[in-house]
Structures are given as C-alpha cells and as structure tokens.
Amino acid sequence: MRPDGRKPAQLRPIKIIRDFNIYAEGSVLIEFGNTKVIVTASVEDKVPPFLKGTGQGWITAEYSMIPRASETRSLREVVRGSPSGRTHEIQRLIGRSLRAAVDLKKLGEKTIWIDCDVIQADGGTRVASITGAFIAVADACIKLTKQNLVKANPLKDYVAAISVGKVRNEIVLDLNYTEDSNAQVDMNLVMTGKGEFVEIGATGEENTFSQEDFNKMLEYGKSGIERLIKIQKEFIEGIPSIGHWERKNIKEFVYKE
C-alpha cells in the first residue's frame, strides 16, 4: 500500500489554474497532489549572444523553491550566493523539454523565459514544472501569433513529464516525497504528444535494477504522460500536423483518478 493509498500506476490529483499571474504572457499554478508550482512564460525581444543574427529564438528556464516549500526552512539561493547543482540540472531539463515542443526558427529572435517557483514541495517538482510550463508557453505562443509578432505559431507538439520509481520492490508512478526519499530506483520521463522521448533519466539509489523493472517503469511513465497530455488538451487545442493551436476558454481544471 502506498502512503497515500494510491494504486501503483495512479497519478495524484492534479489541479491547474490558468492565468495565475496577470502580467506574464502565459502562466499557471499547477498542483500534483501537495506539490504546487507557479509557472510563468515571459517573452523578450532579444536572444543570447550566440543566437544574434541567426533569426532563431531561444527558450530557457529558471527554477527555485521558496524558503518554506518543504518541511524545514531553507535559505534562498540568492542568499547562499549561487544556485545549487540540483537547481542547474532542473533548469536545464525544463529548458530542453520545452525547446522540444517549439520550432525556434518560427519563434524568431525572441526568448521565452520559463520561471518555475515551487511554493510547496512534496515530490515531482520538476515534472510538474515541465507539464505546467507547456500550457504557459503555449498561451504565450498563441498570444504572439494573434498579435502578428510571429509569422506562424512556433508550437510543434505537446510535452509533459512524470516521475516513476521502485519503492519497497514495487514499481510506482508519480512519487510523493516520502516515496521519493525511500526509492530504490528513481526515473524522470519527458515525452511529446507524438510519443517520442525528450528525456529518460533512471538512477539506482544504492541499488541496481533489471530490464524488467525498466520496461515496467517505462510502461507506467508513458501511460501517465498520455493522461497528462489529455489534461493539457483541456486548455490547449492542438493539431500539430497542420500547425493549428488554439487556447480553450477554460480557467481551471481538476483531475482525479
């Protein structure tokens, strides 16, 4: 039995509130169970120096946790002087994941900044950030298109992420903090709407794992991501093959299994 009573392949309740920030081109508050992340997508009319003059845009991410996002207060990273290695790793993962969903040439010389601020952490903060970021970025791209600031909508596909792991010799989906801290194996999976992989990161925590374990984690993860993309489709109507993307008139959505 899992700590919260879920079945092995069951997602936590998921809640998404759109336009949580009134200033950003796209924003959501996304909740995976007790994990809560504010995600904003902001557009700048400039690109990093290595892209100047190329006609290509860029997507990058920043990630942080407020001091009391977890059981004990932590210092803000700005006070410590620099982001931790974990923070750098998560920021790069979020950026890579969203770049997989956007045609950077169609974006033109613009940068989309994704800011992910964890206000409560109970496992899966990075995958919640990625899943919520797609909606925020999609809203930003749709806004750019409607304002004729890009020639065509740069969105290519949906993208979402989920955690899977092996806890007490059982493969489970969407780990909370208790499960994550006791996991024998931890995997983060990022996939597109077409079912293609952006990232597979599986690590044994002082344990090894078998091909059978890996296959089952992959099976659970793919199934979880398919459900997450269905949730994204409640907010964003997309037909990637013809470049059709529309914002649906929905402010909030709650999903429970």
Swiss-Prot record:
Phosphate binds at residues 86, 124-126. Transmembrane segments: none annotated. GO terms for molecular function: 3'-5'-RNA exonuclease activity; tRNA binding; tRNA nucleotidyltransferase activity. Belongs to the RNase PH family. Keywords: Nucleotidyltransferase, RNA-binding, rRNA processing, Transferase, tRNA processing, tRNA-binding. It catalyses: tRNA(n+1) + phosphate = tRNA(n) + a ribonucleoside 5'-diphosphate. Its EC number is 2.7.7.56. CDD domains: RNase_PH_bact. Phosphorolytic 3'-5' exoribonuclease that plays an important role in tRNA 3'-end maturation. Removes nucleotide residues following the 3'-CCA terminus of tRNAs; can also add nucleotides to the ends of RNA molecules by using nucleoside diphosphates as substrates, but this may not be physiologically important. Probably plays a role in initiation of 16S rRNA degradation (leading to ribosome degradation) during starvation. It comes from the Bacteria. This is Ribonuclease PH. PROSITE patterns: RIBONUCLEASE_PH. Homohexameric ring arranged as a trimer of dimers. It comes from Sulfurihydrogenibium sp. (strain YO3AOP1). One of its GO terms (biological process) is tRNA processing. The gene is rph. The keyword rRNA processing applies. The keyword Metal-binding does not apply.
